[in-house]
Amino acid sequence: MSQVEKVSILGSDSIHVGYGIQDHIVEETLTNLKSSTYVIITDSNMEATAPYQTLSSKFEAGLKEFRPESRLFYYAVSPGENNKSRETKAQVEDFLLQKGCTRDTVIIAVGGGVVGDMIGFVAATFMRGVRVVQVPTTLLAMVDSSIGGKTAVDTPLGKNFVGAFHQPKYVFVDVSFLTTLPTRQFINGMAEVVKTAAIWNEEEFTRLENFAKTFIAVVTSDNIDLATIKDDLVKTVLESIRVKADVVSADEKESSLRNLLNFGHTIGHAIEAIVTPQALHGECVAVGMVKEAELARYWGVLSPVAVARLVNCIAAYNLPTSVGDKIFVQRIGHKRHFIQINTLLEKMAIDKKNDGSKIRTVILEAIGKCYQLKAHEVSKQDLSFVLTDETLVHPFQEETTPKENVVIPPGSKSISNRALILAALGKGTVRIKNLLHSDDTKHMLAAVAALKGAEISTEDNGDTIVVKGNGGNFITCDEQLYLGNAGTASRFLTTVASLVNVNEQSNDYTVLTGNARMQERPVGPLVNALRANGSEIEYLNNEGSLPLKIKAGKGLKGGRVELAATISSQYVSSILMCAPYAEKEVTLALVGGKPISQLYIDMTIAMMKDFGISVTRDPHEEHTYHIPKGVYSNPGVYEVESDASSATYPLAFAAMTGTSCTVPNIGSSSLQGDARFAVDVLKPMGCTVEQTSTSTTVRGPSKGSLKPLTHVDMEPMTDAFLTASVVAAIANSSVPTQITGIANQRVKECNRILAMVDELAKFGVRAEELPDGIEIYGIDYKNLKVPSLENRGVCTYDDHRVAMSFSLLAGMCPEPVLITERSCTGKTWPGWWDVLHTKFGVELEGYEEPKDLNDPALLVNKEVNGDKSIVVIGMRAAGKSTLSRWIADFMGFELIDLDTVFEQTHGDIREYIKANGWGRFRELEAGIMKEYLTKCSSRHVISTGGGIVESEESRDILKSYTKTGGIVLHLHRDLDETIVFLSSDTTRPAYVSEIKDVWARREKWYHECSNYHFYSSHCGTEEEFKKLRHSFVSYLKTITGAGLSPVPKGRSFVLSLACSDLNDIAENLEDIVAGCEAIELRVDLLKDYSPSFVADQTAVLRKFVNLPIIYTIRTKGQGGNFPDEDVQALEQLSYLGIKLGVDYLDVQLSNSEKFVKSIIEKKAFTKIIATHIDLAGLPWTRAEWDNKYNQGISLNADVIQLVGFAHAFQDNIDLEQFRANHTITPLIAFNAGEHGKLSRVLNRTLTPVTSELLSNVSGNGQLTVGEINRCFSEIGGLSRRNFYIVGNPISHSRSPQLHTAGYEKLNLPHRFSKFETDYAQKVYEEVMTKPGFGGLAVTIPLKLDIMKYVSELSESAKIIGAVNTVTPLDGQPGKFYGDNTDWYGITQSFVRHGVPSFGNSSVNGMVVGGGGTSRAAAFALHQMGCKKIYMVNRTTSKLHEIKSSLPSDFNIEVLETVDQVEAADPVSLVVSCVPADKPLDSELLNKVERILYHGKNQEKRSFVPTLLDAAYKPRVTPIMKIAEEKFGWAVVPGVEMLVNQGVLQFKVHTVFTPPYKNVYEAVVDDNV
């Protein structure tokens, strides 16, 4: 039998730990726990595993041997947290009662935390308490939930809210059970292990730090073999259990000490409550531990080093350290947006360990030790600060600011990075003290370790870093070295990577990469110098920046190396430090002028001497150094000096506030240039400065009396210029402060000089850029402006020095100032905000930008395209020129045709190819594309030649662009039409081969080079051309993220098309989809699966129907037609749907996890419907349905669709119970078959329906919209409601006809009547307060009067200032909602008449008239995107009233004179709101005609200018006649506005969209 370790808890050795101890479990239980009945309870997942089955067999055998008279029962609950409920507990208890179990029963709970908690609670209450044995099978359960006797079930209001303390008789921890654990669950459990060590045992924490790499390597391998780490794993579990057992023994009922076990849980549980089940408990606690450790640091209790150790240890186990962690965000998807400060605080307020509503957390004092051994009350303000990356810096208060202060900054970043490189290159062991623990050094340490350059460990609770150097013997590794935005590390490691040798088991190269900003920062001069010295270095993205691919085994040749050092001294230091390892001695000559930051070069040389290599300056050649060959000899101890750049911030604080501050460990003897800041900058500005060789003290003048510096050369301390700039900002004088010598600051984390100019302007301080510096015009601090929250306060550009500098100026303002991205200070001073708060007494407050959580843009994980340029590819005649122009119009981009660019440089393409051949042409073509993608990377549409994909170089460029998130759009049209067109085109080169052969060759290239695809259907008429443009712009909105529609919230239907070719029904599509919110394309039922045909089918849908497309490929195993075995084709066809920009992609959960994840990773802005179909009729009470639902949630699906099969009516009832319990994600759930029709009726979201106009039905038991509504109404789900048109006169109103037509078509039971009156009060008393009231259509004279009877207003109603639609507010009896749909009537009328969405292009509109409708017209034109809205009327006083009452961003101009009309920009859209029954005033007509004339004749217009007349009688009004016949404008009759506003009104009333054709005909019938 394997060794068993016993742990005592509450005086009993009842916790037994070992590996493979199942025989011991059986023998111990049956020997010592005598019973007539043993019940083993697990879940259905564990039930199927080999270890469980072995344990069951051994129990059965043991029972025969030890207790032959006893009974043994088994029970399996459904798995998952959602089944840890009172209902499941009752089911278990019913089973025990049915089996005749009595008080002597022994229950053995085998499973994870869910089983242990719930079955423990069963044991606590069954027969008033029976014995229980815990056999935990997950790491989390082994070290946490099974220990200590806590039992519980969840309730709808929270986790573990109903439970009891009930100690198990035994806890048997058999670590071999972990072989059944998925990798993620394994890692999840390590959070609790790290926690127990962090609060109790520093020695064990150190062991865990060292064990992490081995552990992760084993548990993430394809074939997990725990035997290789068995001893370490048992010790890991055992030590964690011992901690918890000690704590529980001292405090069983969690009255004091046991609260320590909740370290990380206050915040972690709050996060978990929001993101479960996508994120696991341990993952959330890991984030919680980091945040609670940061809170302890914020209080000044925990050292920054300890926080860094904790963060690094958690990260080493692949656990998240923030809610912004890349993997964490991928897992929780759009729920990231729900993690908001107020929500978290609300969750924390109901934590069980709180004192009433006072939030308490566990505070670490050191690794292995808790502060005062209790949980502490925490203010919401302090919590809000640590929970967000944005902070409000409150004004510095004289009463809370210490008059004198001593601050010790962290270790120098410059010295720390150099010390690590030298130590890794050196031989022997060095103990580095006061090393900066920051993002930069973390990346450096990780890189050195990855390259096997040194063995790295810690001492003194992490304060000392021990580096055992390998003498420069680095070898390649598998992974890329990610350096974040660590510029110093990237430049030093570029040369180090040139020294790396080849690891035969890995790559023959090293890749250095970083974040987006790092991939813009220059490294070119260094690379050029290294290339010239024998290194092979390749740029993988942008020329001159990371990522770099550096060939291993090349080394440095040595000899003379010339380097341009006018941009960065770090290039020089990089080569200096590595030069001793070159083949020959190095002579380093710095060319191109005086080197920048000479003091940092001197620092490097001095440090090299400390490590045993002496550099000599050439006595004759300026800026030239001789470096001997050799190996560094590591000193025993190396002390890193505090960071002089960081020291400038506390010193500047003293200068600005008139107080005193001492930095005790930086003085005149410092290696760092920034040590001169106090003497050279602050002293001349009026400060008293005392500087010894080792310390610096600054005392500021009285507040507000700083003097400007006429000129200061800060070349020796360039990083400190930002600090100097904010001090100069309040040096009030007519003389500006001029700072020079800082040109290198333009290529740091950001362009710091420009950043300082832009951000100072937000404070009302003028600053100007100089060629190598900045000039600042200081003002009185009392006159500082407060950067507005609306404009997002101070932007830090993710730059630590920008953030720290402006944190000082912010406190000088009269009101709090927002600083964004505050955590960027982690680069050099992770604890800066804590120092500001604790040492300087500054009030800080967390801030979070308000979000509309209903914004569909929050539901996607992809960033919107924004200003990023769009590349268009495709065959000639595919429509690239036209559609590229449409893209440019919509996006507001410039259009570049690369063929035109070529001809401007090289002449006619045909002639060039004749003279030079296709090969040379393709080479130049690729070069041009690369050039323009670089210099026109934003706000351009780049249209390419048809053969751009013929060149491999061009293909690589295009594919690289898609990988960086750029859009490469492939346009295509019917090939036969293309051939007809190209056969007659003599302006382009003839193809060597036939057109079809060319397409056959290029097709796969087009698909692999593009990430989006649009098929242009043939347009035979102007009307079809307009439809194409409208559908293309809708497509463009989807793929760029500019226009995303949310999942419907009310009852909604989707028309499921079972057609082999949609062209057969195209003309009837608008009628077919009546009443539906989406349309499903069943791709598997199409006659052809080729990309071109499938794309054509989506084009048909877009041409005839303006509805979201659901793209579905159903395999035969899931009731469809696509072959189950052709997985590769299924994946390609699914990805095609994403490229086609469909709104929804149906993904079958029956596919492999790898398949599903690969599709979801590419989904962009397409929503995912995670679908599972079981046509065998699996009961809805089975756990498999829970598993599928949770699987959909874990994939961050936007909608989950579960389809069963009904054998009996009861199946529908069971389904509704399931639906009621599964509300996290929108659910489509119904039963197929005749018996399942009721479930279709009861389904709320996107119910699949058919149409009476279709001959084929895609689903068994499918119904029409009308059938469902009628049935739902008959069973009481849809009550009859009464709607009215109110106002006077209304006798000729067509609203009753419009709404009634919609009711009849959709089988809605409602009634629409007229209620004629002039009095809103009468409407309220006699209509709105009556039972069955559904809503109002409001017309004159009541649109204003009715507003006092509504409780809420839509945005449109608020701005327009009138209501035309009223509905009762759901769940709020006696309260009503007011809306205005007139604006929608205008916009949709324009859209239906071919006016495209013009997005960011410059289109102007005009409103004629000054009545109530004019306000709706102005609102409509603004919604459409008009940049400027002109208004004209016979009398202008009303127009000025309208202008002043509407938002300023409507950009309204009132045209009063003819001169103003003539000076106006051309107008493309006009809405006439004047009566049509009398002629226009002549003066007004003159102005209107001039506008119409200029609109028609404007130079740049992308559509026919269009006029809409809001008057619907007569059908053709005088102004329409003038616009169309005299000036060639398109015109829209007012009846269209009436219908379109009614369509939205109908939807507001009923949640359904009425069939347009039916309601239109009802309105125009007899309406001439």
UniProtKB/Swiss-Prot annotation:
Residues binding Zn(2+), per UniProt: E192, H265, H281
Pathway in which this enzyme or protein is active: Metabolic intermediate biosynthesis; chorismate biosynthesis; chorismate from D-erythrose 4-phosphate and phosphoenolpyruvate: step 2/7; Metabolic intermediate biosynthesis; chorismate biosynthesis; chorismate from D-erythrose 4-phosphate and phosphoenolpyruvate: step 3/7; Metabolic intermediate biosynthesis; chorismate biosynthesis; chorismate from D-erythrose 4-phosphate and phosphoenolpyruvate: step 4/7; Metabolic intermediate biosynthesis; chorismate biosynthesis; chorismate from D-erythrose 4-phosphate and phosphoenolpyruvate: step 5/7
Region entry 3-dehydroquinase, spans: 1057-1267
Catalysis performed (reactions): 7-phospho-2-dehydro-3-deoxy-D-arabino-heptonate = 3-dehydroquinate + phosphate; 3-dehydroquinate = 3-dehydroshikimate + H2O; shikimate + NADP(+) = 3-dehydroshikimate + NADPH + H(+); shikimate + ATP = 3-phosphoshikimate + ADP + H(+)
Compartment annotation: Cytoplasm
Essential cofactor(s): Zn(2+)
Statement: the UniProt record of this protein carries the keyword Amino-acid biosynthesis: yes
Catalytic site: E254, H269, C824
GO biological process, one term: aromatic amino acid family biosynthetic process
PROSITE patterns hit by this protein: EPSP_SYNTHASE_1, EPSP_SYNTHASE_2, SHIKIMATE_KINASE
Region (EPSP synthase), start-end ranges: 393-842
Main location group: cytoplasm
Residues annotated for 7-phospho-2-dehydro-3-deoxy-D-arabino-heptonate binding in this entry: 128, 144, 150, 160, 192-195, 244, 258-262, 265, 281, 352
This enzyme's EC code(s): 4.2.3.4, 2.5.1.19, 2.7.1.71, 4.2.1.10
GO molecular function, one term: shikimate kinase activity
Region (3-dehydroquinate synthase): 1-380
Listed Pfam families: DHQ_synthase, DHQS_C, DHquinase_I, EPSP_synthase, Shikimate_DH, Shikimate_dh_N, SKI
Family: In the N-terminal section; belongs to the sugar phosphate cyclases superfamily. Dehydroquinate synthase family.
Quaternary structure (record): Homodimer.
Name of the protein: Pentafunctional AROM polypeptide
Organism: Clavispora lusitaniae (strain ATCC 42720)
